[in-house]
Regions:
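Extended terminal accessory/targeting regions
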Residues: 2-9, 16, 20-159
Length: 159
């Protein structure tokens, strides 16, 4: 009797586990559109991404990779220019498009969005300092255009 009762209880417990263990949650169907919206060259795209980054929990169902090494081996704030957030968004684009298997098709736009972000940083400065910032931004942009692909292939992001 005890053996039979133990078997029935074990079977009931397993049924409960199976019943509550439902299928793994898939990312929402609009994930590619959200990713695209957050990686465009416009200020609106940048601002939407910054807002989402500040509230990542609201986007957890999408499974985005928010990790960043900022500007990789380059200074995050060269000569005092705050490029860190632009680098973080660039990393976001590289990492998530690589995970989606569509990095090659989007790399150029991601690099252009990075440059647009850097230019927006530079726009806040007066003529002389802006020229220096713009020159530094151009250098960072050329670096990601030239070396971003190889870095994305080996698992790091160059931003």
């Amino acid at each position: 009797m005890r053996t039979r009762l133990a078997t029935v209880l074990a079977a009931a417990a397993m049924t409960g586990i199976v019943a509550f263990a439902g299928p793994a949650a898939a990312a929402p169907a609009d994930k590619p559109q959200v990713l695209s919206n957050w990686t465009q060259t416009s200020a609106a795209s940048y601002n939407a991404w910054v807002s989402a980054r500040g509230n990542q929990g609201a986007w957890s169902a999408y499974g985005f990779d928010w990790s960043t090494d900022y500007c990789t081996t380059s200074p995050d704030n060269p000569f005092g220019f705050p490029f860190q957030t632009a680098c973080a968004r660039h990393d976001f684009g590289y990492r998530n498009y690589k995970a989606a298997g569509s990095f090659d098709a989007n790399k150029s736009r991601l690099d252009d969005a990075f440059y647009a972000d850097l230019k927006r940083v530079c726009a806040q400065y007066g003529t002389v300092k802006k020229a220096s910032c713009d020159s530094t931004a151009w250098t960072y942009y050329q670096a990601v255009k030239a070396f971003g692909f190889s870095a994305a292939v080996d698992g790091t992001a160059v931003a």
